[in-house]
Amino acid sequence: MTTQTNSEPLTNSTEGDDIILRTAGLTKRFGKLEAVKDLNLELRRGEVFGFLGPNGAGKSTTVGMILGLVAPTSGQIELFGHSLTGNRWDQLRRVGAVIEEPAFYPYLSGWNNLEALARAIGSIPGAKITEVLERVNLLDRAGDRYDHYSMGMKQRLGIASTLLRDPELIILDEPTSGLDPAGTKEVRDLIPQLAHEHRAVFLCSHLLHEVELVCDRVTIIKQGVMLANAPVQELLTKGQLLQIKVNDPGQAASILTNLPWIISVKRENDYLIVDAPKDSASEINKALAESNIFASELVNRNVSLESVFLELTGGDSGD
């Protein structure tokens, strides 16, 4: 039984129409398992939003609730300023989703597949098919059979199919999974362009480097609980990764681990990889020198979204 605690809009009138998606206290339990716990999300128009977490984190359950496929146990979901507890289809018509590999007729051309879909939707002219194929750079291959398409072309045709109805929110689940480098770049280049057309893109992916390149903001969850929610650049500039070579890495790791302001210490052969507050290198040197441990090398290592993700999730990958 779904319980929605409040039917009042989550969005106040001063925020305008920029907020496309908002959840408040979103929770889903399967028996005793709490798959999603008290999740608060917000997605604005023009934004590419990354939704990240290890396997089993609750990403698919969350997407299912947003799309009306899974009933929340408690909490609220609001699309375009309206709760999904009302006439949800009015809101969901404005949402497009590509979940895993799109399903098309393999023996039909790209054009004919979209034409069949347009007939099923109704009131979509042929000019719109031309427009969306051109939008995803497939117009010159529209006459080719679907089963002759590369993986990247199939994924772009899937995105084209969602664009037939001009969605204001596009949900993409692993859109570059299984693609070769060329296909990955094609999809990666397309995603921010879609958001810049007064839409929002909700992106689920385990390819953290790709997320770092295309997303404006990310939420990271683990076991249904939000661990981080911030602009990508903010996450990348919060700390400092230092690569340190010392004469006694074991003792050095013990000393640094006991410093309350050190975030983490990992050992890689003769090196220590230290996640610490910005501009703390001199303090680290001082702490080691007081125990007669001296760094022969201390250099900055670039902070990546992957390193932030692994730190927050305790080493769980997104695969």
Role assignments for model-derived ranges:
Residues M1-T27, G315-D319:
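ABC-family P-loop ATPase nucleotide-binding domain
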Residues D18-T23, K28-K222, A228:
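ABC transporter nucleotide-binding domains
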Residues V48, A103, G158, E168, ...:
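Generic structural signal for secondary-structure transition and capping sites
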Residues G110, V232, N302-L305:
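Structural motif detector for alpha-helix initiation sites
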Residues E186-D275:
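ABC transporter nucleotide-binding domain
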Residues T219, E311-G314:
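Short low-complexity, flexible loop/linker segments enriched in glycine and/or proline
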Residues L241-L312, D319:
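Short, charged/small-residue-rich alpha-helical element at the C-terminal edge
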